[in-house]
Amino acid sequence: LRFDAKGRVWYSVAASNHIGVYDPRDGSHRWIRLPAPTWGQAFSSRALPFFLWLSRNFDLSGASGGEGVSAPVPYGVDVAPDGGIWFSQLNAHRIGRIDPETLEVEIVDTPFTAPRRLRFDGHGKLWIPGFSSGLLARFDPQTKKFETWEIPIEPRGSETPYALNVDRERDLVWICGTNSDTLLRFDPRTESFTVYPLPTRVTYTRELDFDREGRVWTSNSNMPAWQIEGQMPRVLRLDPHALPVPE
């Protein structure tokens, strides 16, 4: 969920390939159907109500799904400084912009796979985690150019960054080390990473936020929850100013 300057709430509807917008002033909802890269993905998104009805009314246990058709899966959403609404399509390997007034959609292919929960920094640049590509990307909406950095977790390419957030006051990018029980900080000025190991094993972090002191907050979100060490999910707070910087 992201709020724009008018107080409207923008959100992704992953299964049916929509971005939704809710205006609390009048209670109105609107849904923007996003383009799909293939005919099969477009059909599967539109036919979702039929598939759900089919699964509720017929016993499909034991049926083979074959190779199947992946859905585009709109995922991350954020509001740009100019008011534009940007989103990612996880399985379509692209990002896009929605004009908040005309609702016209512009699509941009990414040079990496599986863009997920993206965020803008204070300079109007869009930061994107490459979930299945193990990298961090920065996109300039003005030049339409991408820059990428490999996340320094061994073995290289094994990290699956689920989400990131930008501490705009300090101009730092924080990333969920979802596959390595870490949080990572990236400094765009030096193009360097700092890796902070978490105190619990088999964590799964899906979101980050900050408090006024610059401390980082996240939570464990395993499914099922008992997979985590100690079988008890936790809310975590990391204070980067109170810890020695890891070598």
Protein language model regions, located:
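Conserved beta-strand positions in repeat-built beta-propeller and related beta-rich domains
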Residues: 9-15, 70, 85-91, 126-132, ...
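Beta-rich catalytic cores
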Residues: 15, 73, 91, 114, ...
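A short loop-to-beta-strand structural motif that recurs across blades of beta-propeller domains
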Residues: 18-21, 94-96, 135-138, 182-184, ...
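Short loop/turn segments that connect beta-strands within beta-propeller blades
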Residues: 23-27, 99-103, 140-144, 187-191, ...
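Blade-level signature of beta-propeller repeat domains, shared across WD40, Kelch, NHL, RCC1
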Residues: 205-247
